[in-house]
Swiss-Prot record:
Superkingdom of origin: Bacteria
Entry-linked HAMAP family: TsaD (MF_01445)
One Pfam family in the UniProt entry: TsaD
Organism of origin: Agrobacterium fabrum (strain C58 / ATCC 33970)
Gene of this entry: tsaD
Molecular function terms, GO-annotated: iron ion binding; N(6)-L-threonylcarbamoyladenine synthase activity
Subcellular location: Cytoplasm
InterPro entries associated with the record: ATPase_NBD, Gcp-like_dom, KAE1/TsaD, TsaD
NCBIfam families: gcp_kae1, T6A_TsaD_YgjD
Name by which UniProt lists this protein: tRNA N6-adenosine threonylcarbamoyltransferase
Entry binding sites for substrate: 141-145, 174, 187, 288
Length: 365
């Protein structure tokens, strides 16, 4: 193997346009040389959510410039990269088309191999880039489009242990915020309001707590929030804070039960693992401090290492896409043909049962 491999990564699956140059050294260590992300928050905030057509147009307008900026920041030219990695799914099909077609064009023009990357795999492998984790480990992905507990056995080897049967957790945060008249994105707005609220004022449900299966459900909690708000309308600022705090507490207690059962299962299935077992958290909701504290305490109780990559690498970014490509290259996996097509739905675990449920990105992958 050469002393290092260098990849250009491209990410356009939802409402962030991103490009990155990442290096994998011969010892397996990863290094982010440049990482450029352009958020579309302003374009979508007036609509209270992501508008697919607007997102796709924004990717078209920004991506070429971001690729140039990523190369400039890294001090390299296209000739210096070993491959191109572009998100191919899951996500909004318009955005995926923009990023994948750009990746194909660059790969063709520069004579470089193309790796079409599963966005979820990027999240799953990020902890190996940031913390050098060894396989296997558990990953909790909590975002606007996905809520999944996944066993990460190896590159390309994923086993879904739990998923949402209805709303994704990030979607529940956004809808709660919208119901209460809080700004988009809803996650930070709910968290900020909750800091001033009484988490015990409203006894909100904790969906699926106590069940042996490791799946999640948040639609009932969202409905309970609506009922609580309607019952005391019109809402004062303190009412809103109390509802947010109660909602956040219910979410944290639900995750504590669901993930706690997952950690116990991991110990049973991997009793002789070398070193400390690990739980990785990824996705935009992973920025929530109460959720992080809950998961940290849970890991401490079960003897797990809690790994939360920096916030900028928990949300959508191109560094994780580049790294996933590097992981595949390092294993000698074949590059993708330029005819590869984007996939709006692309589960990490292809053998897992498809559950009913729709989030911002459509059917749960």
């Amino acid at each position: 193997m050469p002393p290092f491999l260098r990849i250009l990564g491209i990410e356009t699956s939802c409402d962030e346009t991103a490009a990155s140059i990442v290096v994998r050294h011969a010892d397996g260590r990863g290094e982010i040389v440049s990482d450029v992300v352009l958020s579309q928050l302003e374009e979508h905030s007036a609509y209270g959510g992501v508008v697919p057509e607007i997102a796709a147009r924004a990717h078209v307008e920004a991506l070429d410039t971001l690729v140039e900026e990523a190369l400039d920041q890294a001090g390299v030219k296209l000739a210096d990269v070993d491959a191109i990695a572009a998100t191919s799914g899951p996500g909004l099909i318009g955005g995926l088309l923009v990023g994948l077609m750009t990746g194909k064009a660059i790969a063709k023009a520069a004579g470089k191999p193309l790796y079409a990357i599963n966005h979820l795999e990027g999240h799953a492998l990020t902890a190996r880039l940031t913390d050098g984790l060894s396989f296997p480990y558990l990953m909790l992905l909590v975002s606007g489009g996905h809520t999944q507990l996944v066993l990460v056995r190896g590159v390309g080897e994923y086993e879904r242990w739990g998923t949402t049967i209805d709303d994704a957790l990030g979607e529940a945060f956004d809808k709660t915020a919208k119901l209460l008249g809080l700004p988009y994105p809803g996650g930070p707005a709910v968290e900020n309001a909750a800091a001033k609220g009484d988490p015990d004022r409203f006894p909100l449900p904790r969906p699926m707590v106590g069940e042996a299966r490791l799946d999640f459900s948040f639609s009932g909690l969202k409905t309970a929030v609506r009922q609580a708000a309607t019952a005391i309308a019109p809402l004062s600022e303190q009412d809103i804070a109390d509802i947010c705090a109660s909602f956040q507490k219910a979410v944290s207690r639900t995750l504590k039960d669901r993930i706690g059962r997952g950690l116990a299962r991991f110990k049973v299935e991997f009793p002789h693992i070398n070193g400390e077992p690990a739980l990785v958290v990824a996705g935009g909701v992973a920025a929530n401090q109460e959720i992080r504290q809950t998961l940290q305490a849970l890991c401490d109780t079960h003897g797990f290492r809690f790994v939360a990559p920096p916030h900028r690498l928990c949300t959508d970014n191109a560094a994780m896409i580049a790294w996933a490509g590097l992981e595949r290259m390092a294993e000698g996996r074949q590059a993708d043909a330029l005819e590869v097509a984007p996939r709006s739905r692309w589960p990490l675990d292809g053998s897992a049962e498809t559950l009913i449920g729709f989030g911002k990105r459509g059917a749960k992958a």
